[in-house]
């Protein structure tokens, strides 16, 4: 049987270029947007997700289709796309899609998706982001646009960085400073959550989670942030 990559290669030959395909997909998504959303009478919770599909073959006709990221499934090469969804009554409605091309910044991707929402007349109550978007440029973009959000802070390396927040005895709220050699420093509000695994998370004991947040009511406790993000 042909491999998944081979099937994608065959299908790709029958598809239009990425820009044309993206426009077509977004036209379909817009047409399928629920009627209650189109009324534009309220703000919605939104989720912006990043999907990376492992790629083990040679790049297609356009090298820009292949992006690089942290190792996964034996490769650092991926096809990538980002989506923005409305979260309503425990359901998700994807309203826009953006392909990720080689060399594109997450800041550019996020700005495009937010602008797409604006063009559709959709207001944001709070945004939930994939951890793949956590960076100084993206956080600065959200700050400039005054968007309320919850975004996981990735844990990298074996020491330092966000791990310093895990030295406390319990869940807490604090401030955290991101340091980027290229984009400078940025201090954000952070929520740190300690969860006892009870056999989950593939390990015993406790596991820590950290989130960059903005616009949360003071009454919201750390464990509530964990549940809200789930």
What are these regions (language model features)?
Residues 1-3, 42-56, 84, 124-134, ...:
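Short, conserved catalytic/metal-binding motifs centered on acidic residues
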Residues 4, 18, 22, 135, ...:
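Alpha-helix initiation and N-capping motif
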Residues 8-88:
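Active-site-proximal, Lys/Arg-enriched surface segment
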Residues 19-33, 107-109, 211-229:
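Short, motif-level signal for alpha-helix interfacial/capping segments enriched in acidic residues
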Residues 33-37, 68-74, 139, 177-180, ...:
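A generic local secondary-structure boundary/capping motif
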Residues 66-123, 205-216:
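Electropositive, glycine- and tryptophan-enriched low-complexity nucleic-acid-binding patches
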Residues 103-164:
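Domain-level cores of phosphate- or acyl-group-handling catalytic modules
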Residues 145-230:
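An anionic, glycine-rich sequence signature occurring as long contiguous blocks
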């Amino acid at each position: 049987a042909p491999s998944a990559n081979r099937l994608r290669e065959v299908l790709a030959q029958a598809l239009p270029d990425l820009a044309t395909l993206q426009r077509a997909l977004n036209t379909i998504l817009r047409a399928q947007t629920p009627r209650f959303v189109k009324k534009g009478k309220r703000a919605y919770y939104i989720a912006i997700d990043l999907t990376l599909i492992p790629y083990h073959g040679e790049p297609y006709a356009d090298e820009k289709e292949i992006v690089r990221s942290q190792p996964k499934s034996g490769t650092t090469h991926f096809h990538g796309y980002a989506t923005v969804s409305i979260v309503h009554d425990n359901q998700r409605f994807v309203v826009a899609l953006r392909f990720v091309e080689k060399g594109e910044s997450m800041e550019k991707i996020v700005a495009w998706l937010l602008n797409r929402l604006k063009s559709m007349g959709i207001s944001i109550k709070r945004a939930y982001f994939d951890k793949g978007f956590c960076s100084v440029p993206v956080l600065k973009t959200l700050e400039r646009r005054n968007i309320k959000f919850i975004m996981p802070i990735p844990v990298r390396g074996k020491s330092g960085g966000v791990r310093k927040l895990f030295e406390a005895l319990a869940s807490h709220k604090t401030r955290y400073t991101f340091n980027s050699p290229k984009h400078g420093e940025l201090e954000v509000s952070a929520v740190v959550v300690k969860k006892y695994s009870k056999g989950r998370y593939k390990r015993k004991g406790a596991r820590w989670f950290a989130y960059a947040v903005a616009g949360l009511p003071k009454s919201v406790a750390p464990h509530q942030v964990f549940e809200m993000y789930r």
